[in-house]
């Protein structure tokens, strides 16, 4: 009798996503002393939380079926021609950037470039981005992206507060000409900090002595181009700082903010090649004066040298960041928008200064022609000067004009019942302008002559604000203008880096799992990419279905009652979660509850976020096994019971174990009046096995760019939705375009909406069974590595059963004491083996935290373990004197090709340096630089493209 042939394709994707094959899985289980994956799960998960997860999800669809399903959803979105503007514009993504960057796993699967030696490609692209921003804004220091324009404005507000000499002031001025969504996010950020945001027309502003800072929009949201020079001087005279939200494309033609006195410039790089995406993700920017660089939020790429004196790039001044300064950090932002910043960077590289200026001139000329034509039809723009946006007083015709436009599949900006607006962009054509005239013309009116107006129309930019300074003079912006050259430049940069397309990235607490191609495909569909976030609701039915279904999926995975998809990073999810707790306490008259308990092992974002949410941090101790010290927690909860707002706790713990006492911890906090925030960074060990919403959590954020397969993008984008129990649901983030209007934490109602299809696809293809399998295999893979390496490196923390969760921590401190070899030396030596290092010195200094994820095969796990064992042998050779304690393969790692072919004076061989295992002979990654000098980089800070002489030397 023949075997039964399987006729269904359900669940077939599971085996594509999960790395170990059946025979390997069984062998790995046997190594651990188990005969089934269920037995391992039963042993790892604490008894008190077993059975809390009931994944009520259908079976997984095949890749083809899931793509067909999401295509049907996408087709429900209506793609109108949009002239809404308001910070979001249609753009052309150049095809070579789409194909060679956005759709290239060498770019989108990379991690944040904390290991500079294996990140030189994307660091160079980010340095180009910083140079682009610095040039266009006229300010010397720019960061490597923020989350969106509105959150960048909020960062600018707190930046001004820190630096203003008007220390007594708690008032921040925001122009009423700023984008409305920016003002909403400012209000959200200001309230917990005791800051009052005063929104008014700057032209009616009297005394400014009560303000510590100001935000101005340039050009204004309604289209006006104002001269702010005198106003900036007034604010400076009052010891206030001035931030300007500026349109990058307009800055190719207009005087940059830095030249009229602005202290900070912020904005969005979206219109540099990044689709609308229903609101995101898009890269924001932040630039400032050199004197303020150490107070900047976000990551900063700087120029340094490697140990051979060769120019090398790195992340600079990391002591500002939350993973080091914790509650004293300049910001809680961790993941930003690197992938989108790189798209904008390459858009500028491809077009160059001339191309960008041509685009800007064309957009402005078309807007001027449109305005002149409307004037002949009896409609005059309210603005005397403008770049690309107009406001029209249309009176009683307003509603009818919107209806007429929509009948032609066109969206105009809704301002009020008497006025409307429109913004042009690089996709606007002559025929589009003529269609707009036809909409506004009364019956019987002749349409203007486009050609005649094109010959006669004058610029509507103010003569006194025309840009005089040059832009983008560096060679990188003047060389790669043919597709061939750009394609090769992108390939050259990608080849410098290590991403998931080449190797496992075993970073603890980062969950660098497979980003399957089928999950990525919908991201570039026009139905998801070309929808404006403020389009009429009936045009986004597909997105509404997608978000409704995804929220239900995530509720099923977490045990929570409601989900908000708005937070566009894990840091924003943390923030939204604590704001929900704060608002809940306030609604009950408990405004005095402001103490947040945080274990000493917590990630630095936790205390930084608590500080932003207006809470006071009280640190609780951990015991010798890395668990929360429950008695210390109990004592502090009782001590602060009248002020206790919340606890922030990561589960499984930051130490990589399932703490037995998690239910007791939650109970202690609840008994003393607090709420439980369970950080979802480690959710990849729990889906299908236990649910935080069912064992005591009141709110959690999830990292969709970890557990749910959105790629890290080299440092973003991320999505950090929150799940809440029903009593917190009324306090989730709101938005002007949602039922709840208050509490927006980012500019768009659904945050980074255009990458949500990735998570929808992952869950739909895995189904409930597959999601549980993913968690189980993540735990198996981590325990397999732990078991293989424990005789070579002590595993610092395990559960009571001797097992870890989905990651393990290797203690290298004894090695440092016995040999002088540091955790940094081991991390750099792994590069010679072709591996990205695990997480270094977090959560414990002198350790490596390893998280392999479920996507890695046994072969890859063994390759990594073999590398670590070989490195231990080299360390042993240092310990016994066989290798010199200072001149050895670890201290000199990583080794470059240039070093190998040059003069060789080391006491170990070239072969040992670069081919420590035979498998590298067939497949070798060559780092482009040697070990980077961090101290040199911070002491000699350069954060823009170096001069042509340095460029040639490099």
Curated annotation (Swiss-Prot):
Required cofactor names: pyridoxal 5'-phosphate
Family annotation (InterPro entries): GcvP, GDC-P_C, GDC-P_N, GDC_P, PyrdxlP-dep_Trfase, PyrdxlP-dep_Trfase_major, PyrdxlP-dep_Trfase_small
Highest taxon of the lineage: Bacteria
Coiled coil regions in record: none
EC number annotated for this UniProt entry: 1.4.4.2
Catalytic activity: N(6)-[(R)-lipoyl]-L-lysyl-[glycine-cleavage complex H protein] + glycine + H(+) = N(6)-[(R)-S(8)-aminomethyldihydrolipoyl]-L-lysyl-[glycine-cleavage complex H protein] + CO2
Keyword Oxidoreductase found: yes
Family: Belongs to the GcvP family.
Xref: HAMAP family: GcvP
Name of the protein this chain belongs to: Glycine dehydrogenase (decarboxylating)
Species, as recorded: Pseudomonas syringae pv. syringae (strain B728a)
Native organism taxonomy: Bacteria, Pseudomonadati, Pseudomonadota, Gammaproteobacteria, Pseudomonadales
Protein's gene: gcvP
């Amino acid at each position: 009798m023949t075997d039964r042939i399987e006729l269904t394709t359900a669940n077939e994707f599971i085996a594509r996503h999960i790395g170990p094959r059946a025979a390997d899985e069984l062998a790995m289980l046997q190594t651990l002393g188990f005969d089934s994956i269920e037995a391992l799960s039963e042993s790892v998960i604490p008894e008190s939380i077993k059975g809390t997860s009931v994944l009520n999800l259908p079976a997984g669809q095949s890749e083809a079926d899931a793509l067909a399903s999401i295509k049907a959803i996408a087709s429900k979105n209506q793609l109108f021609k949009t002239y809404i503007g308001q910070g979001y514009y249609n753009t052309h993504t150049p095809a070579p950037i789409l194909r060679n960057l956005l759709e290239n796993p060498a770019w989108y699967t990379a991690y944040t470039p904390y290991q500079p030696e294996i990140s030189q490609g994307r660091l160079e692209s980010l340095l180009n981005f910083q140079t682009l921003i610095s040039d266009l804004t006229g300010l010397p220091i720019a960061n490597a992206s923020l989350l969106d324009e509105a959150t960048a404005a909020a960062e600018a507000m707190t930046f001004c507060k820190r630096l203003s000499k008007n220390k007594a002031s708690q008032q921040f001025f925001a122009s009423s000409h700023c984008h409305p969504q920016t003002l909403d996010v400012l209000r959200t950020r200001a309230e917990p900090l005791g800051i009052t945001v005063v929104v008014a027309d700057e032209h009616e502003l009297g005394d400014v002595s009560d303000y510590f800072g100001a935000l101005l929009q340039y050009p204004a949201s309604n289209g006006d181009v104002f001269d702010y020079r005198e106003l900036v001087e007034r604010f400076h005279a009052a010891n206030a700082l001035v931030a300007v939200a500026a349109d990058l494309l307009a800055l190719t033609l207009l005087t940059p903010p830095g030249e009229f006195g602005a202290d900070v410039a912020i904005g969005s790089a979206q219109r540099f090649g990044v689709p609308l995406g229903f609101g995101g993700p898009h890269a924001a920017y932040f630039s400032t004066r050199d004197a303020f660089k150490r107070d900047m939020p976000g990551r900063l790429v700087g120029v340094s040298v490697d140990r051979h004196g060769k120019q090398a790039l790195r992340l600079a001044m990391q002591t500002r960041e939350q993973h080091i300064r914790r509650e004293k950090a300049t910001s809680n932002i961790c993941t930003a928008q690197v992938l989108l910043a790189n798209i904008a960077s390459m858009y500028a590289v491809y077009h160059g200064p001339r191309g960008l200026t041509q685009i800007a001139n064309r957009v402005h000329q078309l807007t001027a022609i449109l305005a002149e034509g409307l004037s002949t039809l009896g409609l005059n723009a309210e603005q005397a000067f403008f770049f690309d946006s107009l406001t029209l007083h249309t009176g009683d015709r307003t509603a009818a004009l919107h209806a007429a436009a929509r009948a032609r599949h066109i969206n105009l900006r809704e301002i009020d019942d008497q006025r409307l607006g429109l913004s042009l962009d690089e996709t606007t054509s002559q025929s589009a302008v003529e269609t707009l005239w036809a909409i506004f013309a009364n019956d019987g009116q002749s349409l203007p002559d486009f050609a005649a107006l094109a010959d006669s129309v004058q610029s509507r930019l103010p003569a006194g604000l025309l840009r005089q300074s040059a832009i983008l003079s560096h060679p990188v912006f003047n060389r790669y203008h043919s597709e061939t050259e750009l394609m090769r430049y992108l390939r050259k940069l990608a080849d410098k880096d290590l991403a998931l397309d080449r190797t496992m990235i075993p970073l603890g607490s980062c969950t660098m799992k497979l980003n399957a191609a089928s999950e990525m495909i919908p991201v570039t569909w026009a139905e998801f990419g070309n929808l404006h976030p403020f389009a009429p609701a009936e045009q986004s039915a597909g997105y509404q279905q997608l978000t409704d279904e995804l929220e239900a999926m995530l509720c099923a995975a977490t045990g929570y009652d409601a989900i908000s998809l708005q937070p566009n990073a894990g840091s924003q999810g943390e923030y939204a979660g604590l704001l929900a707790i704060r608002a809940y306490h306030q609604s009950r008259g408990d405004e005095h509850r402001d103490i947040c308990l945080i274990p000493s092992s917590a990630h630095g974002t936790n205390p930084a976020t608590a500080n932003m949410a207006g809470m006071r941090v009280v640190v609780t101790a951990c015991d010798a096994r890395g668990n929360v010290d429950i008695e210390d927690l109990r004592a502090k909860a009782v001590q602060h019971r009248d002020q206790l707002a919340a606890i922030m706790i990561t589960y499984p713990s930051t130490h990589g174990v399932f703490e037995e006492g998690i239910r007791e911890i939650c109970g202690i906090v609840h008994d003393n009046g607090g709420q439980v925030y369970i950080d979802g960074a480690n959710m990849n060990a729990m889906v299908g096995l236990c649910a935080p919403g069912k064992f005591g959590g009141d709110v959690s954020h999830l990292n969709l760019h970890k557990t749910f397969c959105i790629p890290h993008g080299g440092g973003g984008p991320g999505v950090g939705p929150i799940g809440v129990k029903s009593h917190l649901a009324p306090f989730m983030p709101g938005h002007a375009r949602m039922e709840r209007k208050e509490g927006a934490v980012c500019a768009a109602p659904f945050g980074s909406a255009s990458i949500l299809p990735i998570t929808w696809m992952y869950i739909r293809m895995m189904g409930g069974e597959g999601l549980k399998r993913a968690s189980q295999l993540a735990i198996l893979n981590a325990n397999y590595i732990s078991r293989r390496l424990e005789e070579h490196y002590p595993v610092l923390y395990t559960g009571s059963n001797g097992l870890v969760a989905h990651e393990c921590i290797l203690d290298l401190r004894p090695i440092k004491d016995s040999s002088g070899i540091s955790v940094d030396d081991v991390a750099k030596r792994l590069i010679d083996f072709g591996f990205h290092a695990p997480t270094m010195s977090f959560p414990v200094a002198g350790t490596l935290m390893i998280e392999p994820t479920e996507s890695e095969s046994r072969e890859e796990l063994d390759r990594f373990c073999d590398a670590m064992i070989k490195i231990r042998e080299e360390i042993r050779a240092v310990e016994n004197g066989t290798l010199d304690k200072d001149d050895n393969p670890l201290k000199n790692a990583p080794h470059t090709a240039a070093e190998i072919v040059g003069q060789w004076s080391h006491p170990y061989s070239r072969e040992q340096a670069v081919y420590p295992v035979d498998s590298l002979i067939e497949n070798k990654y060559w780092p482009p630089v040697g070990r980077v000098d961090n101290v040199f980089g911070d002491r000699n800070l350069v954060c823009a493209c170096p001069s042509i002489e340095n460029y040639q030397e490099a």
